[in-house]
Amino acid sequence: MKTRSVCFFLVISMLLISCNLWTITGNKMITPSNVVISENRDVSGFNAINFSTLGKINLMQGDQESLNISGPDNVVPEIITEVNNGNLVIRTKENIDINPLGNDNPLTFTIVVKDLTSFKISGAGDVQMEALTTPELTIEMSGAGKIVQNQVSTENLDLSISGLGGIDVSGQATQARIDISGAGSVNAPDLQTQTANVTISGLGSATLWVTDQLTGNISGAGSVSYYGDPQTKTSSTGAGSFKSLGSK
């Protein structure tokens, strides 16, 4: 019995060791090194971004598009960056997974855009967007992460969250649409909007500033808090609630 227990322990140990190299899906697992490199990628002609790996993103508006990636020297080469039909795609190579607990040197993406109308992120990302002026902007977030958008100026703003993500946004938008499924949150008390439509299913929450008209629907235990004195047309089922925070 003792011999059998020792053999079992050895087998389990070998399996655990192998899990550091390969995931249960058969993908190769890379543990980031402690050597940091920086690499400029040749990108141009895009107004949309699709990000599906992990890391920190610093995004700003400027006259010249650019992309810089810094991070572990064994991870940066595994990141694909390509522009397809105006969409900048940033992803990990196929059959590759990155150990998110590898070290204290995360991937960092510094992106300069001339214009941005769509930003989609899936996976785990920490995004910092600086002041942005654009006719319309759609932000779609799935998975876990945080997006901070400072001082956006746009006619139409569309925010969508599925999962545990959070979006903080300030600035001005003529119209805003917010769609949250899961436990995501939108924090926008400093985003002045004329009209807003909010749809929440699950435990999501949103804080807004609306001047003219607010419409919305909550199914589940979600909540919407708003500044301003807009006309309202809202409905909720379950424990959902709409709450006025008074004038701004």
State the predicted function of each range.
Residues 1-248:
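Intrinsically disordered, low-complexity terminal regions
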